[in-house]
Regions:
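Sequence-level preference for short, compositionally simple segments enriched
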Residues: 1-207
Length: 207
């Protein structure tokens, strides 16, 4: 399935708005520019596998707990990949695992994230980061105080944009993956495990 907003570069133009819990997407495309994918629900857990998401400014944004696995995240211009609004006290915000971050020729200055809300969270685990990712990696959205509350981290990323020598000082480099087992990130209180049960879930969908 392809979700596309064809409005062009006119400001916010959401292609897909997700509020419900236990949202599962596999082999889908999300096309747009600013604010392509709105992970809206504060209590929502969302899983994306082998999906393609493209945009420019804050094109993955919202309050939800979201796991991207084996996805391609493509910047079609300068901007910010994510703009999390994670609530205070939430264990996870955005988690990217084994994803590839690519950029169009005109995408030369892209940040991994900036905090839409103070307690924003985004973690990139063993992802391939293209040269369009700026050396600083993270942006504080013009508010120094966000650096004390937002949680941004990386683990064993590769690619031209993965060097940590000039990373923003408020970012973290994980030494291990304690707390980031992909089968536990979305568990919640009901034990939802789309990573393990993904194929079974797809088979149970009535067509």
């Amino acid at each position: 399935i392809t979700f596309e907003n064809t409005a062009g570069r006119v400001g916010q133009a959401v292609a897909c708005f997700i509020e419900g819990d236990r949202a599962y997407f596999k082999n889908c495309r999300f096309l747009g520019n600013q604010d392509t994918l709105y992970n809206y629900g504060k209590e929502s857990r969302q899983y994306f596998e082998n999906c393609y998401v493209e945009g420019t400014v804050d094109f993955i944004f919202g309050w939800s707990t979201v796991l991207f696995k084996d996805c391609t995240i493509h910047s079609v211009g300068d901007g910010y990949v994510t703009a999390p609004a994670t609530d205070k006290g939430k264990k996870y915000g955005y988690v990217f695992v084994n994803c590839k971050l690519t950029g169009a020729d005109e995408a030369k200055k892209v940040y991994l994230s900036r905090p839409w809300r103070p307690y924003a969270q985004a973690v990139y685990i063993q992802c391939e980061l293209g040269k369009h990712i700026v050396p600083e990696g993270w942006n504080n959205w013009g508010k120094k105080e966000n650096e004390k509350t937002a949680y941004y981290a990386e683990y064993q990323n590769t690619g031209e944009g993965a060097s940590v020598k000039e990373r923003a000082s408020f970012g973290h480099q994980l030494k291990n993956l304690d707390g980031y087992n992909v089968e536990e990130i979305l568990l919640g209180e009901d034990g939802w495990n789309p990573v393990k049960n993904g194929n079974k879930l797809l088979k149970n969908i009535k067509r």
